[in-house]
A protein has these predicted regions:
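Short, flexible loop segments at boundaries between secondary-structure elements
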Residues: 133-162, 200-203, 257-285
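Short helix-loop-beta junction
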Residues: 60-73, 180-194
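Local cysteine-cluster metal-coordination motifs and their immediate loop/turn environment
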Residues: 45-50, 79-90, 116-125, 166-177, ...
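Active-site glycine- and acidic-residue-rich loops that bind
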Residues: 51-58, 149, 172-189
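A short, charged/proline- and glycine-enriched loop
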Residues: 36-41, 159-165
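A short, acidic, amphipathic alpha-helical segment used as a generic capping/interface helix at domain edges
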Residues: 221-239
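Iron-sulfur-cluster electron-transfer modules
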Residues: 1-118, 123-130
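Long, compositionally biased charged/polar accessory segments in the mid-to-C-terminal portions
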Residues: 193-199, 217-226
Length: 285
């Protein structure tokens, strides 16, 4: 089960934790254990970014954007373990406390002050739940940092083909933490991109179906929430649904494929959309 995997391997899939940094191959990102010197941010990769093929592309795109902006980052690599978000949402408080204590000890040992992450679930846990356990850090979501870098001119994008994009609000980024403008500002900064809104957006946004640990449950009756949401996105006429959460990416991309919309409705993270405009030619994913 996912709980057993968390206990044994520190991630819900039960993947060997020694492979946590494999996604970063060739990018030259130092780990904290390497003694990287002064870094602006610790990049908290999260379980999905580390082990899920789709989301590995997202964290690579994020790292490439930060490198292009001259932001020095480091990772924990195999020393990172699940934040425990899923365990707490699913009612296993003991497992949450165990995982959280391990992470807080690691982060504090390295003197980490600032963290950036592309996962709103990790973001919410690190920012709002770790302080009670002795982990006090400045935590930003990658969309917030990217929007700031674009506004400051540290990150420059080239014009790309015209694209109509509908942005999907992640529950943990939006309603739980009030981050609505940053991902939209980042997308608007991309030349040739038109941002459209779905009827249910911002404070009235609609869950992708993965929240509250439902990512790890099987749907049994009724219409899947993710199917409803992709239909809503398709109705806007947009060619791309932009997301800012690994679970939203998984749920909506699967729903688009299951609903026969794979050719007409791409589901991509904000970082992937921006990274496409870093240089000529599309990137992976």
């Amino acid at each position: 089960s996912a709980f057993k995997n968390l206990e044994k391997a520190g991630n819900p899939w039960g993947v060997d934790p020694s492979t946590r940094a494999d996604w970063a191959e060739g990018l030259g990102i130092p780990s904290m254990a390497d003694g990287p010197g002064e870094v602006e941010y610790l990049f908290w990769v999260g379980c999905a970014g580390s082990f899920d093929d789709r989301n590995r592309k997202v964290v690579r795109a994020t790292a490439e954007l930060l490198a292009a902006a001259g932001v020095r980052i480091a990772i924990l690599g195999p020393e990172e373990t699940c934040t425990g978000d899923f365990a707490r949402r699913a009612g296993n408080e003991y497992l949450f406390q165990t995982l959280a204590a391990q992470n807080v000890e690691t982060l504090n040992r390295y003197g980490v002050r600032r963290i950036v992450t592309a996962c709103p679930h990790c973001f919410n846990t690190l920012r709002n739940e770790y302080p009670q356990l002795g982990g006090r850090y400045e935590v930003v979501h990658h969309s917030e940092l990217l929007a700031r870098l674009l506004a400051e001119g540290r990150l420059r994008l080239e014009p790309g083909s015209s694209l109509s994009v509908a942005f999907h609000d992640s529950c943990y980024l939006g309603r739980h933490n009030g981050v609505y403008d940053a991902p939209r500002d980042a997308l608007r900064a991309a030349p040739g991109l038109e941002l459209v809104e779905m009827p249910r957006s911002r404070e009235n946004g609609f869950c992708c179906g993965a929240g509250g640990a439902r990512m790890w449950m099987e749907e049994r009756i009724g219409t899947k929430v993710c199917d409803d949401r992709t239909a809503e996105a398709a109705a806007t006429g947009a060619g791309v649904v932009a997301v800012a959460c690994p679970f939203c990416l998984t749920m909506l991309a699967d729903a688009a494929a299951d609903g026969g919309r794979e050719e007409t409705l791409a589901v991509r993270d904000v970082a992937q959309i921006l990274a496409d405009r870093l240089s000529r030619g599309p990137r992976e994913g």
